[in-house]
């Protein structure tokens, strides 16, 4: 029925394209009409359209004319030289109808999927121009600085011709320049540059003049699937060195390495013994039928199953798994031990290991044997695995009648510190084990210049400056024997998901979005529209070639490279990691094939390598770095030879990455071909393929070196990729649900902070904080006044110590009501505040000679005090939230929903944060002591203040230096 309706009415995509096609015709009509205008008359269209928008016309109404103007300008610029990256290029682009379709979709808030080479960069100019007519901030987000600079210089020339201003944000731009850039009508930059400026404006700036942004109206995100999906789990973080250095990584690194060594040696011994039994059968296609031999083979495979749980990448294990029948037997034991009725046998078998590694879920678990080895043989402590029961410890202290209240408090502090140290040690131990067992050099990271540099799993690019969180980076530094740096402390953080939700309007463009359309719809309310190509794609997509073993696969790849190389075709070989790219490079050198390698270790030569990758006979081995945003241009001889030949050495876990690699060839009508070579030992097949795979392998086992190719295998691959994508989507959605809680708190704090920065009269803001503190104190006093263990005298003692007021007990008891008591305390505090700061203001006025300047100085002092405490308490709160996030998952053991628990407890933490901020501010204001000095500078500068604020619990008098002309005596 649904198929019939689709055939009758068309799919939703077809209906949308049909509706937009009418607008395309209107745009083309406007373009023809504007052809008769002079250049000056066409330029005047911009202020005219702006005025019409101000007069109430909608952007939708202005769209045909605005897009027609842009198309006409592109036509007029034809043949004009434009300077791009220091070189002059002739303008040769006029939007096609399909590009106008994409531009309409972007203005309407769609993600447009346009194939490689279809001109996404030019397409974006039209919605950028239209939305810039509003005068509101319009941003084009790219994936790197080079593309931002290039697009601003190249297609930005159209916007500048029409009288709009353009700016580009690149890393290293100074703050004063950034502010000017943000004033431009259209700003180009990367997601991280826009995001970090948002964080700096809301967490680092201490005066409104230091803020650079001007809001978030409309953004187009280039390669939107990369930004909002691949990078979604990586938050933007502004951090600094932590206050304390955790020595546990240095102390435990050798012990952890020793424990991992014991595990490796034990697994190697088991594997070697198993191979002695299996060696005679590795070269045969059919296993013997003798019962005793079959039992011996089965036991050897059982032993290798155990090895797979201790060292999944063991070489003997990998070699044995090349045999389909032996592989099936190992997997049969896996099914056996995962059955519920065999659970005890499984646990008994696994208990012989020191560590159980779960490669599928990227996790591990220390066994009792491993803990015993750690304590008895390696020199660890039993306390490393046992956390303190703080409730029990505190109860014991309270029950001790020999202790005074002060002693009890000191004991509790000591126990708390001991618990913190023990948790830090246990956490460090776990991260060191993770670094050794799950993090692989040249796959997850590289070592360069005494530093650990992360490799982006999606792009293959090195991520200099980025560090693994929660101490994992320090653990890897310890593992690789490089300098162990301090753990950083987070000052401000936001995920890209929540950052881009700040924009009123959001659109995107990419070549690969349709596979993630569900996620874009559910999380961002963005719909994907596939735009037709201008020219038919001539790419030949060969069927995937499946091989039994990795060894056979590489032999086939080399043979294919040699064959294609002889024909003169340029070849791009895509690999999944630095390790694989270097391995393939060694094989090519052995076969005397000249080639270049592009990976995270030599990314500095990327532009040069890519420039030569399209020449006839070129062979380029690359990681995913060459997969996205890379334009490989062919010379004439290469086109004649058949175009670029893309060879994939494995399938990525994401179908989008495979499509990106394929998309490097056959752009804009060029010829090209793509083929993937796979083995059943590839990680994707090994961990995520269907259980039916073993049966298929046993039935379709081809001769040595011969490929298998069948639609059934293609479906298996797609199923495995969908399974991984589904799991990753669940993780991203789960992460976002937690971050949404943090996001609401972040917005509240940033709004409070901005109110302080932009307030004209900080005395009003300070008095508001005093009133809030008075209300909190009233609640506390009345709560304790009605309790059996009345501690009203203690509260009053603390109050008189912290603030210059003394409460009247009788008056409080007479009032009895929270609001009345709050008004009473508030009046006392505000009166004391007025006395203190009126005297300060009078003193400043006398010295400076200007009441207005003195008022400004006092405002600066109050603003700095308030901002400093907001920032300090927020940093502490971020740490508390991270700890809560890491611990709340354990609540599921008690049949509680961790997310609900997180929301409830984070709300309590946030209430405490607001209370602590207000109390800290008010305490500091009353504790403030100032001494005034005058600078000897002869110039008659405007009076300014230099202040240094200290923690309010350990404050020292601040010195204000008034800069001005010395008074004559």
From Swiss-Prot:
CDD domains for this protein: DEXDc_SecA, SF2_C_secA
Main location: membrane
Binding site for ATP: 99, 117-121, 631
Membrane topology: Peripheral membrane protein
Keyword Transport in record: yes
UniProt protein name: Protein translocase subunit SecA
Subunit note: Monomer and homodimer. Part of the essential Sec protein translocation apparatus which comprises SecA, SecYEG and auxiliary proteins SecDF. Other proteins may also be involved.
GO molecular function terms listed in the Swiss-Prot or TrEMBL record: ATP binding; protein-exporting ATPase activity
Subcellular location as annotated: Cell inner membrane; Cytoplasm
Cellular component, GO annotation: cell envelope Sec protein transport complex; cytoplasm; plasma membrane
Annotated InterPro entries: Helicase_ATP-bd, Helicase_C-like, P-loop_NTPase, SecA, SecA_CS, SecA_DEAD, SecA_motor_DEAD, SecA_preprotein_X-link_dom
Similarity section: Belongs to the SecA family.
Keyword annotations: ATP-binding, Cell inner membrane, Cell membrane, Cytoplasm, Membrane, Nucleotide-binding, Protein transport, Translocase, Translocation, Transport
Any Gene Ontology biological process: protein targeting
UniProt organism field: Chlamydia trachomatis serovar D (strain ATCC VR-885 / DSM 19411 / UW-3/Cx)
Catalytic activity: ATP + H2O + cellular proteinSide 1 = ADP + phosphate + cellular proteinSide 2
Enzyme Commission number, as recorded: 7.4.2.8
Domain of life: Bacteria
Keyword Hydrolase: no
Protein role: Part of the Sec protein translocase complex. Interacts with the SecYEG preprotein conducting channel. Has a central role in coupling the hydrolysis of ATP to the transfer of proteins into and across the cell membrane, serving as an ATP-driven molecular motor driving the stepwise translocation of polypeptide chains across the membrane.
Pfam families the record matches: P-loop_SecA (PF21090), SecA_DEAD (PF07517), SecA_PP_bind (PF01043), SecA_SW (PF07516)
């Amino acid at each position: 029925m649904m198929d019939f309706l689709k055939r009758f009415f068309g799919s939703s995509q077809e209906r949308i394209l049909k509706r937009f096609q009418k607008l395309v015709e209107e745009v083309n009509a406007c373009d023809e009409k504007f052809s008769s205008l002079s250049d000056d008359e066409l330029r005047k269209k911009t202020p005219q359209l702006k005025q019409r928008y101000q007069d109430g016309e909608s952007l939708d109404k202005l769209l045909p004319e605005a897009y027609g103007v842009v198309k006409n300008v592109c036509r007029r610029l034809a043949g004009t030289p434009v300077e791009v990256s220091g070189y002059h290029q002739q303008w040769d682009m006029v939007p096609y109808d399909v590009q106008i379709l994409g531009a309409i979709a972007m203005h309407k808030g769609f993600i447009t999927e346009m194939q490689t080479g279809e001109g996404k960069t030019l397409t974006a100019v039209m919605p950028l121009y239209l939305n810039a007519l509003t005068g509101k901030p319009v941003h084009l987000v790219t994936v790197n600085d080079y593309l931002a600079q290039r697009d601003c210089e190249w297609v930005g020339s159209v916007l500048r011709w029409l009288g709009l201003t353009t700016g580009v944000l690149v890393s290293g731009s100074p703050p004063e320049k950034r502010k000017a850039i943000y004033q431009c009508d259209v700003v180009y930059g990367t997601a991280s540059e826009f995001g970090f400026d948002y964080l700096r404006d809301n967490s680092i700036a201490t005066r409104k003049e230091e803020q650079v942004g001007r809001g978030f109206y409309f953004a187009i995100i280039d390669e939107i699937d990369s930004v909002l999906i691949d990078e979604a789990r990586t938050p933007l973080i502004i951090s600094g060195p932590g206050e304390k250095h955790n020595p546990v990584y240095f102390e435990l690194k050798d012990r952890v390495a020793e424990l991992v060594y014991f595990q490796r040696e034990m697994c190697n011994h088991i594997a070697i013994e198993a191979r002695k039994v299996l060696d005679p059968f590795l070269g045969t296609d059919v296993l013997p039928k003798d019962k005793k031999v079959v039992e011996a083979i089965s036991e050897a495979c059982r032993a290798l199953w155990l090895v797979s749980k201790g060292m999944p990448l063991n070489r003997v294990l990998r070699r044995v798994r090349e045999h389909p029948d032996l592989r099936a037997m190992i997997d049969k034991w896996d099914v056996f031990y995962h059955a519920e009725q065999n659970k005890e046998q499984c646990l008994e078998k696994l208990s012989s290991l020191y560590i159980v590694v779960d490669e599928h879920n990227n996790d591990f678990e220390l066994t009792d044997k491993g803990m015993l080895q750690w304590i008895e043989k390696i020199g660890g402590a039993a306390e490393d695995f046992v956390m303190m029961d703080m409730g029990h410890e505190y109860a014991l202290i309270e029950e001790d009648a020999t202790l005074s209240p002060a002693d009890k408090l000191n004991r509790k502090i000591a126990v708390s510190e001991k618990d913190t140290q023990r948790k830090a040690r246990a956490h460090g131990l776990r991260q060191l084990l993770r670094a050794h067992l799950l993090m692989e050099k040249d796959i997850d990271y590289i070592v360069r210049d005494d530093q650990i540099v992360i490799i982006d799993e999606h792009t293959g690019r090195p991520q200099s400056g980025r560090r693994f969180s929660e101490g994992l980076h320090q653990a890897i530094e310890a593992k690789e024997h490089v300098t162990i740096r301090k753990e950083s402390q987070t000052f401000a953080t936001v995920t890209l998901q929540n950052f881009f939700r700040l924009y009123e309007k959001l659109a995107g463009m990419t070549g690969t979005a349709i596979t993630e359309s569900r996620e874009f719809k559910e999380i961002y309310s963005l719909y994907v529209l596939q735009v037709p190509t201008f020219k038919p794609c001539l790419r030949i997509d060969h069927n995937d070639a499946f091989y039994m073993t990795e060894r056979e696969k590489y032999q086939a790849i080399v043979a294919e490279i040699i064959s294609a190389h002889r024909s003169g075709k340029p070849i791009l070989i895509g690999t999944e990691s630095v390790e694989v790219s270097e391995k393939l490079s060694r094989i090519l050198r052995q076969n005397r094939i000249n080639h270049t390698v592009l990976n995270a270790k030599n990314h500095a030569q990327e532009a040069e390598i890519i420039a030569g990758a399209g020449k006839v006979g070129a062979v380029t081995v690359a990681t995913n770095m060459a997969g996205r945003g890379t334009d490989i241009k062919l010379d004439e001889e290469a086109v004649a030879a058949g175009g670029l030949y893309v060879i994939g050495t494995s399938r990525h876990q994401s179908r989008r990455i495979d499509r990106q690699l394929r998309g490097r060839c056959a752009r804009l009508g060029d010829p090209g071909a793509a083929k993937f070579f796979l083995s059943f030992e590839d990680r994707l097949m090994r961990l995520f393929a269907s259980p039916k795979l073993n049966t298929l392998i046993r039935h379709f086992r081809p001769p040595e070196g011969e490929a298998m190719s069948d639609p059934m295998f293609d479906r298996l691959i797609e199923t495995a990729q969908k399974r991984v994508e589904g799991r990753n989507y669940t993780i991203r959605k789960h992460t976002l649900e937690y971050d949404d809680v943090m996001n609401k708190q972040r917005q509240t704090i940033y709004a409070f902070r901005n109110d302080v920065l932009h307030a004209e009269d900080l005395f009003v803001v300070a008095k508001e904080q005093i009133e809030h503190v008075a209300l909190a104190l009233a609640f506390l006093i009345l709560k304790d006044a009605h309790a059996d263990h009345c501690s009203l005298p203690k509260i009053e003692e603390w109050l008189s110590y912290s603030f210059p007021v003394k409460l009247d007990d009788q008056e409080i008891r007479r009032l009895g009501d929270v609001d009345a008591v709050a008004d009473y305390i508030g009046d006392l505090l505000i009166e004391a505040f007025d006395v203190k700061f009126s005297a300060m203001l009078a003193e400043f006025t006398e010295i400076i000679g200007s009441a207005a300047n003195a008022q400004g100085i006092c405002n600066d002092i109050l603003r700095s005090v308030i901002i400093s405490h907001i920032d300090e308490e927020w940093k502490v709160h971020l740490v508390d939230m991270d700890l809560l996030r890491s611990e709340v998952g354990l609540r599921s053991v008690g049949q509680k929903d961790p997310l609900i628990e997180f929301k409830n407890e984070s709300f309590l933490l946030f209430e405490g944060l607001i209370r602590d901020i207000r109390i800290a501010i008010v305490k500091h204001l009353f504790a403030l002591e100032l001494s005034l000095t005058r600078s000897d500078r002869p110039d008659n500068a405007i009076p300014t203040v230099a202040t240094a604020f200290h923690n309010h619990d350990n404050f020292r008098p601040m010195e204000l230096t008034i800069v001005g002309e010395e008074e004559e005596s």
